[in-house]
């Protein structure tokens, strides 16, 4: 019995009957020889962690576009916070932590530069629309590894595909990530809003503070414990109704006071204009895209299974959505801002 088999045996003995054990995985689309040390979900986690898309998250906006300060969240720090919360829930409920971590690390790979402002811009520009959730799946199935994808397990892909609020993950591990995502972004966005001077802690609605907690630490602890103690011994994860109601109420307050107003919105019109110009430029000059995207475009044209315009739009969206905030700004400056010149 090798190390992987020992771990798989241990999972069967220790994990909850509602957990997804590694040995019970539905596998990958392309079968692979099993590793003698790592389980299937550990390998998935490692593939995501070492992917280029994951590394780019460190320079992608969470809420505030180009904030001045080192302590505002980025898409990467959000992802790590989701992973920590989801693993805490999984450990307490005796779920598969490796599967949970893999889903958490991969759930936001498809996010655009400049956060949801970039996503909204691409959704308007791209034929067929654009969603960061669908793009996350496209990254792991196609775009990574020069068009080969990461060949992740069906369980990890299901968790990534269904992490949005309306999603219904088939595994409890996927459900843990879905709750962790909501808990993480609400709490750290409140924290970043206070740091940005948009409001003070004391200005948060009293009714939500009374139920959820008077500090970021209290709110985080309250919501995580609610998921854990409401879900123990059950085949579906949930939260106490009063906690769910107050979390949604605070989220609505954040939309009214942060997400759709103030500093979080001031620069969005620039993002919209920037991406519109870049999208049109790459439609007209596809050879200016990076080599891997030119390869995918050529491959699609040779296969001839997709409408040429839809294909071009999709590859351009792939390229732009993969950019970091800084790289996107750099490309805009390169193509649309006159350069200084020196006299010979």
Spell out what each predicted region is.
Residues 1-79, 83-89, 96-97, 130-344:
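Histidine-centered, transition-metal-coordinating active-site segments
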Residues 99, 103-146:
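A generic, well-ordered mixed alpha/beta core segment in the N-terminal half of proteins
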């Amino acid at each position: 019995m090798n190390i992987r088999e020992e771990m798989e045996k241990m999972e069967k003995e220790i994990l909850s009957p509602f957990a997804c054990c590694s040995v019970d995985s539905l596998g990958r689309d392309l079968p692979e020889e099993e590793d003698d040390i790592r389980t299937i979900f550990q390998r998935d986690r490692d593939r995501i962690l070492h992917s280029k898309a994951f590394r780019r998250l460190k320079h992608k906006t969470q809420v505030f576009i180009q904030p001045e300060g080192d302590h505002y969240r980025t898409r990467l720090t959000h992802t790590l916070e989701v992973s920590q919360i989801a693993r805490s829930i999984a450990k307490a409920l005796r779920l598969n932590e490796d599967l949970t971590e893999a889903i958490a690390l991969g759930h936001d790979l498809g996010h655009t530069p400049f956060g949801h402002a970039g996503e909204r811009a691409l959704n308007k520009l791209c034929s067929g629309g654009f969603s960061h959730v669908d793009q996350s799946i496209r990254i792991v199935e196609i775009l990574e590894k020069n068009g080969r994808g990461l060949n992740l397990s069906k369980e990890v892909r299901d968790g990534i595909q269904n992490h949005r609020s309306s999603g219904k993950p088939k595994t409890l591990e996927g459900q843990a990530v879905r709750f962790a995502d909501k808990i993480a972004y609400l709490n750290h966005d409140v924290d970043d809003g206070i740091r940005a001077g948009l409001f003070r802690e004391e200005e948060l609605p009293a009714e939500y503070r009374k139920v959820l907690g008077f500090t970021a630490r209290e709110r985080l602890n309250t919501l995580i414990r609610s998921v854990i103690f409401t879900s123990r011994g059950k085949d579906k994860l949930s939260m106490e109704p009063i906690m769910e109601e107050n979390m949604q109420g605070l989220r609505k307050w954040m939309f009214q006071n942060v997400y759709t107003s103030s500093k979080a919105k001031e620069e969005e019109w620039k993002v919209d204009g920037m991406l519109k110009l870049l999208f049109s430029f790459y439609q007209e000059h596809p050879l200016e895209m990076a080599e891997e995207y030119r390869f995918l475009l050529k491959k699609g044209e040779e296969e001839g299974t997709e409408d040429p315009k839809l294909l071009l739009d999709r590859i351009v969206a792939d390229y732009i959505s993969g950019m970091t905030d800084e790289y996107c700004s750099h490309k805009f400056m390169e193509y649309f801002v006159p350069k200084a010149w020196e006299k010979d």
